[in-house]
Amino acid sequence: VPFAESFLAIVSSQEVASGELKNFQVPNLSIREHKALLRQQCRDRRMAVAATASQAIVGHFLSRLHQQPAWQTIALFLPLPGEPDVTSLLAAAPDRRYVFPRVIGKGMEFHHLIDITSQTTAGPWGLREPLASCPVVAIEQIDIMLCPGVAFSHARHRLGKGAGFYDRYLAQTSSHPELIGVTFDHLLFEELPHEEHDILMHDVLTEKGFASQKGASSSLQ
């Protein structure tokens, strides 16, 4: 059975568009094919989410941040269209140090930014990224990392965009900063296809709050 027909036989396009699809399994697909299907469907769905959801995400994180004085260096990301935008944290909590990723070949490094407008430039993948002249911050100095993704699960798995930048970056050390997946609630699934080497998030944050507050275990509680 062709890949597209297998999917359409199980879930209607209305279910996908409405955000009702929280956990689906398509038979006879490899993990790679299953991930590819999820990426496309999730991209379509997240484009419809209102900007107010990003504001709610920032609000929930600020509530947690005020309880965590040890989180001094925070890794953020510059969003693609349709992704949560958490960059307002720089103005909301200016006493912390914020770092952002810059792609270098097949890898990436994080740079300290103070002003996003003047200290970023157009980079690959349609993203803005820090200027190379901005100070580089080593992974060992990052206290907490907010990670983008196409989707996340309650089991804290992350479905990335497929390029593997975060996986390779985090594989540098076994001592990771606290990892928080950031997504919209309709892209938080019960389960996702995953592999043994996939790195788990410590928690997942949506406009409805931290997943750990809804019963999922987390080291951040």
What is each PLM-predicted segment?
Residues 77-79, 101, 147-148, 181-183:
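Short beta-strand segments
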Residues 80, 151, 210:
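Flexible, active-site-proximal loop/turn residues at the rims of small-molecule/cofactor binding pockets
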Residues 135, 158-159:
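Short capping loops/turns at secondary-structure boundaries
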Residues 3, 7-10, 21-140:
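N-terminal active-site beta-alpha-beta segment that forms phosphate/nucleotide-binding
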Residues 128, 148-151:
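A structured binding-face within diverse protein domains that lines the active/interaction site
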Residues 7, 11, 15, 21-33, ...:
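Surface-exposed, charge/polar-rich loops and edge strands
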Residues 162:
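Short polar/charged helix/loop
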Residues 77, 110, 125, 152, ...:
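Aromatic side chains
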